[in-house]
Amino acid sequence: LSDANQTRLKLSQKQFKRLLALVQYAMAQQDIRYYLNGLLLVVKGNEICVVATDGHRLAYARETLAEQLPSIEVILPRKTVIELSRQLQENDDALEISLTPTQAQFRFGAIEFVSKLIDGKFPDYDRVIPKTHDKLVKLSRQTLLQSLQRAKILTNEKTPGVRLVFSNGSLKIIGNNTEREEAQEEIEIGFSGETIDIGFNVNYLLDILNNVTTEEIECHLGDASSSA
């Protein structure tokens, strides 16, 4: 890569592999909005963040860097992201990234990986992320994951929706289908206030829960008509 307009950064293979895992499931696959068929990589100051969206959901993750760097935003193609995820190791060995407005270079171990970038304008992700949700619910990731997996069994394959009903002290998870079959589970939670009944695509929730590693997750809620 040419040294002109180049931003270089260094972090561990494990750190970057983890960042990719936290968002890559939300990338579009064959969207006519070609800039969605990839992942936005942003370097700003001492932070690196990655963002992916398919127009229905958005995933965002960030990591602190050891130094202050010039700002740059690039869109990595979907194939590049998937290949990097496959090649990077779960270790603390160094990964060197060099970015220009048209190319990205990744060096790790004996591998030197160069990719063209997607030329396009990624959506303003910061506007999409809710800032005013004032209701916070903390949940066991594993408990919620298992409940959603069971509820999914009775959802329609084409429209796999579940309802999450938050009320005082409990969360009801309801899955049903066109045959009028219904599955319902209840989890004890620390929630008080007006009941909130929200519908979600269960696969979107499972994608999140299968890719985060924390034992506890936080859910920020507005009302039944708001994103979460």
Task: Please annotate each region the language model reported.
Residues L1-A228:
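Structural preference for solvent-exposed beta-strand-turn elements
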